[in-house]
Structure formats: structure tokens, C-alpha cells
Amino acid sequence: MTHRIAFIGLGAIASDVAAGLLADAAQPCQLAALTRNAADLPPALAGRVALLDGLPGLLAWRPDLVVEAAGQQAIAEHAEGCLRAGLDMIICSAGALADDALRARLIAAAEAGGARIRVPAGAIAGLDYLQAVAGRDDAEVVYESRKPVAAWRAELPGMGIDPDTLAESRTLFSGPAREAALRFPKNLNVAATLALAGIGMTRTRVEVVVDPRARGNQHRIQVRSPLGEMQIELVNAPSPANPKTSWLVAQSVLATIRRHLARFTIG
């Protein structure tokens, strides 16, 4: 069976995912993308990914699955229409879901259209554990994001920090996951994913650190409850095309697509 998969956005993540799907002969796919600029299409995908004209064009193409990888604004613009039309979605820009009102509208749209929303793990691990403790009032979750200067180069000057002279680690934020995800939409989607899987946007605590000595994009997750403790530390290689995101993210999205299409899944 050939699956029809449409992307919203065709940046570093979506391009890597599209290439992975096209290389998988065991799971043939037809691909299309809704993107603001046709020049976004990498040469390797030219002629293999159809370019769509706005949300009407996407709906007319009738995909089996829509993969959003264009940023939080794209969710506000396109997700509700896709879901009401009955199109299952994978949402990569999970930070948008920190907005309770938007999340409620998307869930209502999915219910109206008979569609499903999936959020990939992305750069992190341990979501199954967080889901297991989600209902406990006595659970504590702390997440630390520690990234090198390259991941924050565009934002640091606005915080009064010179990225070229920063020699020591600096804490950029400490607070609840909701605020982290909405304040840093290009860097903290992970915070929203953790909170949605676990104990919520308010109780999930987030520390954001820029560290010139960081070996890569580092993620530390600590969970404590009477059920036990979990500590995870990941050191992900940054994406060659976008240092704000981990190279692993595209593979996580690809795995989520394969689970969505599969008859047999684990986890």
C-alpha cells in the first residue's frame, strides 16, 4: 500500500524525514509539502515531493497523514483545518500546545473530524515513564536543557549576552514548562512534550542553560515519586542544518510515522 504523506514546512527536520521515507522501499510513499518558498525544496527531493498551494491545496491532495515541522505559527494557521477534515497529524512544534486554548481547539477539531494527533519524542527519551507517573500529585519532574552557544546565537544579544565572548555557562531561564515553551519557541519544544506526557505545564520545572563548553545538545530529565526515580541524560549531536535542534529529531519523527502506519508496534 502506498501512503500519502504531506508536510507542513520543509526545513531541516522535514527534509531529512522525507529523504528517509523515500529511501524505504518496504513502505512506499507519495510525498507533498506546504511551504512558503519553493526554493526550500532540497535538490535531492526535487521532482519527488509535490509542492502544495496553501491549506486548500493540502486538503485537495488528500493525504493519509500530515506532518507539521514548520514552527508554532504554522500550527495556529493550519492544524485545526487539517484535523476537522479528518487528517491525522504529527505535530513536531509541541511548544504551541503549551497554549491551553489552542490545544483544546485542536483536540475538539480532531474529535469532530475523527482524526488523531501524535507528538513525537523528538530529542528526548523516557516519555513512557512520565506517562506512568502523570496521574500522581506527589511526582516531581525537572528538565534541564544545556546547549552550546551556536544554538542560542540569534537570541543572546537580545538578552544582553555577547555570544562571541561568553566563557562560562549562563542560566537563561528557570521556571515552569509552559513559560519556557512559549518564550523560546525555537529551542524548547521538548519542555512542552515532557509536560504533556507527564505532570503538566505548571508542575514540570525547566532550567535552560547556554554553555560554551557543552559537547552537544544536552538534555537531563529527573523524575521522583514514591514509585521510584528516573534520571536520564542525553547528549545529542546538533543538526548540521540547524544547531538549535538535535540531529536525532528527524529520526524520531520518522520512527513516529512508521509506528503510525504499522500494524504492529512496541511502546
Curated annotation (Swiss-Prot):
UniProt GO BP: NAD biosynthetic process
Known catalytic reactions: L-aspartate + NADP(+) + H2O = oxaloacetate + NH4(+) + NADPH + H(+); L-aspartate + NAD(+) + H2O = oxaloacetate + NH4(+) + NADH + H(+)
Listed EC numbers: 1.4.1.21
Pathways per UniProt: Cofactor biosynthesis; NAD(+) biosynthesis; iminoaspartate from L-aspartate (dehydrogenase route): step 1/1
Keywords in alphabetical order: NAD, NADP, Oxidoreductase, Pyridine nucleotide biosynthesis
Binding site for NAD(+): 123, 189
MF terms in GO: aspartate dehydrogenase activity; NAD binding; NADP binding; oxidoreductase activity, acting on the CH-NH2 group of donors, NAD or NADP as acceptor
Domain of life from the UniProt record: Bacteria
Active site, renumbered: 219
Record function comment: Specifically catalyzes the NAD or NADP-dependent dehydrogenation of L-aspartate to iminoaspartate.
Cited NCBIfam families: PRK13301.1, PRK13303.1-3, PRK13303.1-4
Note: The iminoaspartate product is unstable in aqueous solution and can decompose to oxaloacetate and ammonia.
Sequence similarity: Belongs to the L-aspartate dehydrogenase family.
PANTHER family: ASPARTATE DEHYDROGENASE DOMAIN-CONTAINING PROTEIN, L-ASPARTATE DEHYDROGENASE-RELATED
Protein name as it appears in the record: L-aspartate dehydrogenase 2
